[in-house]
Amino acid sequence: NLWQLGKMILLETGKIPAKSYGAYGCNCGVLGRCCYVHKXXXXKLTGCDPKXXXYSYSWKXXTIVCGENNSCLKELCECDKAVAICLRENLDTYNKXXXYNYLKPF
């Protein structure tokens, strides 16, 4: 769910997601690709709601580990994990000035 996604982003990037990415207006470049891939992963899910379904995961040795028997919830966890890791891997392209723009469709 959105809360779990936010917590994963915080764990991976050290940034408060709502403040740092909630209104991040640059949907181009790497950040846009991270979000686009996440949106596409979530759109492929069947049998669970990406915004409301809760899944289990843990943080072990600085790594997110998805632990779910339900295949849809496991895939959802993996989608959220992937976007959090993508954002972490691209922190060098994060532009604080773009954090207050309105979201633009991509």
UniProtKB/Swiss-Prot annotation:
Question: In which tissues or organs does this protein occur?
Answer: Expressed by the venom gland.
The answer on whether this UniProt entry bears the keyword Secreted reads yes
PROSITE patterns linked: PA2_ASP
Which residues make up the annotated site Cationic membrane-docking site (MDoS)?
15, 19, 104
Q: Which family does it belong to?
A: Belongs to the phospholipase A2 family. Group II subfamily. K49 sub-subfamily.
- What function is annotated for this protein? Snake venom phospholipase A2 (PLA2) homolog that lacks enzymatic activity. Shows high myotoxin activities. Also shows neurotoxicity, since it induces muscle paralysis when tested on mouse phrenic-diaphragm preparations. Displays edema-inducing activities. Also displays antimicrobial activity against E.coli and C.albicans, as well as antitumoral activity against some human and mice cell lines. In addition, it is effective as parasiticidal agent against Leishmania infantum promastigotes and Trypanosoma cruzi epimastigotes.
| Protein name per Swiss-Prot or TrEMBL | Basic phospholipase A2 homolog BmajPLA2-II
